[in-house]
Amino acid sequence: MENGTKNVEELVKNKGLLSPGGKALLKDNPDNYIKIRGARQNNLKNIDLDIPRDKLVVITGLSGSGKSSLAFDTIYAEGQRRYVESLSSYARMFLGVMDKPDFDTITGLSPAISIDQKSTSRNPRSTVATVTEVYDYLRLLFARVGVPHCPICHREVSKRSVEDIVNEVMKLPIGSKLMLLAPIVQQKKGEFLHISEQYLQKGFSRVRVDGVVYALDEFPTLEKQERHDIELVVDRFILNPELYSRISSSIEQALELGQGLIMLLKINDNSSTIEGKNLGKSNTEVLTYSQRYACPVHPDELIPELEPRLFSFNAPQGACPTCTGLGTRMEIDPNLVFNQNLTIAEGGIRPFNRVQSDSWWLKRLSAVAARYGFSIHVPIRELTEEQKHLILYGTGNEKYEVKISGSGKFKDGATYESIYEGVIPTLERRHKETDSDFMRKDIERFMRVHECQTCHGARLKPVVLAVTIHGLNINDFCNLDVDAMLDILSQDLEFTEAEALIARPILKVIRERVKFMQDVGLGYLELSRAANTLSGGEAQRIRLATQIGSGLQGVLYVLDEPSIGLHQRDNDKLIATLRHLRDLRNTVLVVEHDEDTMMSADYLVDIGPEAGARGGQVISAGTPEEIANDPESLTGKYLSGAKKIPIPKTRRKPKLNQYLTVVGARENNLKNLTVKFPLGVMTVVSGVSGSGKSTLVNEILANELLARLHRAQTVAGEHDRIDGIDNLDKCIVIDQSPIGRTPRSNPATYTGVFTAIRELFATQPEAEIRGYKAGRFSFNVKGGRCETCQGDGVNKIEMHFLPDVYVTCPTCHGKRYNREALEVKYKGKDISDVLNMTIDEAVEFFENIPAIANKLKTIQEVGLGYIRLGQSATTFSGGEAQRIKIATELSRRSTGKTLYILDEPTTGLHTDDVNRLLKILDRLVAGGNTMVIIEHNLHVIKSADWIIDMGPEGGQHGGQIIAEGTPEEIAKNDQTPTGVYLREFLK
């Protein structure tokens, strides 16, 4: 196909399409289509496309071909932009305005909702329950039909009426000397000068302040900064059955004054006067009664009115006061404080490793060491645990004499007395008191997140957790996984008739929302799971379930690979969910590579033919069957079976029969596993979603190896040990995170080739004459860069109510460098020209410079010859970023003792990209290295040398190894879902 052109007549005849290079037009009722004309966003080649409305439409193509440019950057962006444009300028100021995509016309657009993987909540307060709004309904349920209990003795409590309280008082011994009090101030700071006048006018004469009774006209002077208790004396009487009416009236009045709370003092003092007396615990017995919830055994443990906000860990009424509702606390970790191999004098205490030998801090610690008999000149590992504890936590109020030679506030030669606070209390105090973000982040290097010791991760106050429904509190419900929650909700929960009327509609909504989560393959997730620990695929499917629950119609949904992280077994549920969304009369537009999803689509659009500048065209559009029969479509060839990823002819055996063995893995849902990873081969860890793959590989294996081999400050999940680490010298985790967070990062800087290019330019005659060094050719520092745009090539202009506009720098015209730097040339090209070259062009240009050409060739080999050397890192897809990382590893000299860990490397990759990726990974393993891959893609699984399959289910029903062996051995195993699906791929 030349320049994307096709025989128009043939296309019209075969498909009813008009497609000269980038057109797919359908002749039907125009109201039934989203009509796109002249789309040129990013790499799109002026394409025309008709997308049927109210259908499940899949857009596919190679990584970087322009799928997201069409689906998200054009269709969704324009739908969102039109909605926001319709709002007032004031509203637009808060919402922000999206740039208008580059196209001629788009008609037939509906309101658009994007469900991608990038908008996952990073808020530590967000959980699966809050994101899906299930928690809102649980809070309402507990507030309306929850049964409160005493948080101390756990007995059920209920409200008391005035009559109940009076009857209880009348049961006291006849002749008891009683004083009835109404609390009006409880543990509050202030002078409370208004109380005397306010209550004298109402006819009261006495008040008890901090346990002492005063006449109201002799109200004491109170300390403003201290907390006080003040109770109004409502009545005094000696208990007699004949006083029932008076006592009842007084109690009713006291309850009104005390806002539902009263105190009854049973006075043991026989004197007639009470003014000025301290009526405290020594001579009185205090009885507390409440119209609110209160325990008869522990009346001081008052339970507030049950309302929804009480059950929120984001509200002060319900949140645990220690962790403020987070369930965790940042605490200094002693293991991160010490460098066990160094002495204190050499900097063995990491937070203070830069202090001078004559510093106040070190001299004070030397005084501590002298008193407790240890030296600051021996390695920390040789100190006793008691001595380390002294260093970490201090020595209390003990004082030490420290002689200082200094200036400023310290007099030279003077001796000062000081306590030694300890490393951890010092860091905690500074972290709390500092206003400097830099200092706070610096201290946080030595902190780790630990479970809150007050609420033990429950996030709520004890009084809230004491409210139950059928024996379960709200945290117990949230600790259930979705499947278990559905099991409980499907039972007939017993309520009174009145409670059932309230609970039934709430339970119905909860049941529906939880069922939608199960339908998208998330049955293993616990509702209390923090949202910031979810993978992109999990977060996307949660949002998908939430959208289904909304029941909207006539909406355009745009999804980005919802099948990511989903086992083939759960894929059918996801497809059924997408169809359900479509059946609600919505248009569902999905960017996807999964073959089952493509074959289930109503309409399929194939973008290509290649990636980057060589992509951006509609190669084929139609039903999946039509695409499969189109010889021009690369996707069609894989769908029809005309093209396949070959099965390896042989499977590698472990190198020298060596293994990396994880012993006693118990983190999260792992069931005390011992797992052997063979060295020198490609191992795939497979299994249903939530079975424990990421916990085993990422949280235990990767974190432990990074800490042991690279001294990274990573914390491995709970396990006993890992054997065989001595057979490795490096552990490299290759994920799909960006290669840089700013537009200044690019492939040239990430791979390190830009250093060699700058050094090459510095050796050119013109550069040597002018005395230019390599730094002159950096756009990040002063010297060679354009100072007008500071090396960006563009200037940002703020437009307030309109989107920010980026205009080409008028000084350098987008070249990033000043005139002097651009006057230095190599083979007729300046440094800016080189950055604008594609990798393919650069390989040819630098063919005689091996230090540059060899690194560039590895990028070319991973299929990224189309990207530009200076292309911004923020423009790359996850698949492209990962392949740049793999190329960087390929260009390094292999030791044959490296472990590579990849987590779902096929994310965002077309089947043809997967084929290319497997060849690259095979090269890394062929050098004697070890590869461990977490993957659901059956093409990768069938290409492995060894498979570790986990299950049998997700969540608490997972965490076990259910099968190990070669792909052929796994395929014969009927007990594993992976094996059942793998059989078809091995035929």
Q: At which residue positions do the language-model features occur?
A:
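Conserved phosphate-binding elements of NTP-dependent enzyme cores
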Residues: M1-K987
